[in-house]
A protein has these predicted regions:
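SAM-dependent methyltransferase
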Residues: 87-149
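C-terminal lobe and adjacent flexible extensions of AdoMet/dcAdoMet transferase-like proteins
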Residues: 144-182
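A short beta-strand submotif of the Rossmann-like class I SAM-dependent methyltransferase core
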Residues: 53-57
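A short His-aromatic
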Residues: 59-61
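Conserved class I S-adenosyl-L-methionine
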Residues: 1-38
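A short glycine-rich, Lys/Arg-flanked "PGG" loop and its adjoining helix->strand segment in the class I
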Residues: 66-83
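A short acidic, Gly/Pro-enriched loop at the edge of an enzyme's catalytic core
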Residues: 42-51
Length: 182
């Protein structure tokens, strides 16, 4: 989806829409591509100042090489000074320890309508987890970590938020900022 920085807030149906909009404005990005809905609909060509990846569309890619290839495929759409900003799925060490126990890690979200979404996270090794939502069949995902091969190979910078604060390994957020090709 192509948007100007003004349109970014309307695109996001998230609590942090203002934060993503502020990022686009701070970077003075005129051409913005939002890939938060997935990597399947990537355009064949284009040159974007900013590509935003909220909701980690890379989380389902479990292999190092495949993840690096997916990042390279997205990077080809960046302008020379453009940035790819990934809100990476991150599991801090204290939550990984709980997910590694037989009972796993339970996360619950309550919605305005009173419904509750319950996720059971089970660590399976190498930063991979099986997630069961409300008793559904498991989905396998891979969380990011600071030593991630795909990030290192792409020259990414790791931050703790869209405001570029330092990454805190005990915190709950990992933002990867991948530069365009130079």
């Amino acid at each position: 989806m192509l948007a100007t920085s003004r349109d970014l807030v309307e695109m996001r149906l998230r609590d942090d829409a203002a934060e993503w909009k502020a990022l686009a404005e701070r970077l003075e990005a005129r051409r913005v591509l939002d890939i938060g809905a997935g990597l399947e609909g990537l355009p064949d060509e284009g040159e974007f100042d900013l590509i935003v990846a909220p909701n980690d569309p890379f989380a389902g890619i479990l292999d190092d090489g495949a993840r690096a290839a997916a990042i390279a495929n997205v990077r080809r759409l960046l302008a020379r000074d453009g940035l790819l900003v990934i809100e990476g799925l991150y599991v801090p060490p204290q939550e990984d320890a709980v997910a590694s126990t037989p009972d796993g890690l339970i996360r619950e979200r309550k919605f305005d309508d009173g419904s509750v979404e319950r996720e059971l996270w089970t660590a399976i090794g190498q930063h991979q987890y099986e997630i069961r939502t409300n008793g559904s069949a498991p989905t396998r995902v891979r969380a990011w970590h600071c030593g991630e091969t795909a990030l290192r190979e792409s020259g990414a910078r790791i931050a703790g938020g869209l405001d570029e604060r330092d990454f805190d390994p005990w915190g709950d957020r990992l933002i990867a900022v991948v530069p365009g090709w130079s």
